[in-house]
Amino acid sequence: MIASELELLSDKLDEVAMRKIRPQDKIIELIYTHLSMIKEVVVRNGNLRAEFFRNIWMVEKVRKNFDEDEIDLFRKVYTEGKLQGEFDIDNIDLVADITHYCIKGLEVPYIYGRLGHGMTEEMSKPLVAKVVYGALGKVRR
């Protein structure tokens, strides 16, 4: 069950990455798509929720391919952004890894509503973008 849910999430992330929008916007959309879809899957699926938190090693094993695909997706968007002058990144592989693991670390607080408590997505997006753009060396235009 977890594998099929991760496949749906992966497909959705691929759709976001293929959009004809600026790389800086893609990164923010990828972050929010990842978190909202993980939450949706866990909330929708009671036994998956229990399994998700009880047997983390099994989940990590199932997630391995998804995680690798997501990191690769970040690499592609960061490369695109660097080539377009949107990002000032010295090591794309490292930044893609860091991005993936930061988002992964936010999953549980996001699922439980502990991230940006009381804020809507519309309220939090500009703040998240500011943090992300700062890390990517984004120059404001």
Where are these regions (language model features)?
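Hydrophobic alpha-helical connector segments
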Residues: 4, 11-40, 95-99, 125
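Hydrophobic/aromatic-rich alpha-helical bundle segments in the mid-to-C-terminal region
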Residues: 46-53, 60, 82-129, 139-141
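Hydrophobic recognition helices of helix-based DNA-binding modules
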Residues: 5, 9, 13, 38, ...
